């Protein structure tokens, strides 16, 4: 959304070819933009489906779970085995306050529902966009949206799968 090109625009072909050659992952800012000059149509997660189909061996990440288009992001992740998503930047403020919980209760419910719909916990990753929300409170917020049985996957293992070179660094 910050550049006037869809993810499938040919301008990105060299990036995809290099990423494939060097076994790199391509991450996309999707969803809301932090700038009034950003163009939302270029940040819609459905554009990632086009790239996923054209490059089935390339790992792709839909950052921010495509918010506010979480239903579309969930479908792209569910459909394409090479697509991951992260849960970064989904809330701004102080989740520990009653005001925040009141404002975001519907949002948290919707997020939980679309994550469950996708049922691809092996391709859902924790992310923060810190300092928009304190790390401690954001972890608690995301944990409230993810069944406890999937916490290790979401908070750790999915990132190692999406970014395999990260695992080599951590070993």
Positions of predicted regions on the chain:
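Short beta->alpha linker loops
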Residues: 65-68, 130, 154
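Short Gly/Pro-enriched loop/turn and capping motifs at secondary-structure junctions
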Residues: 90-92, 130-133
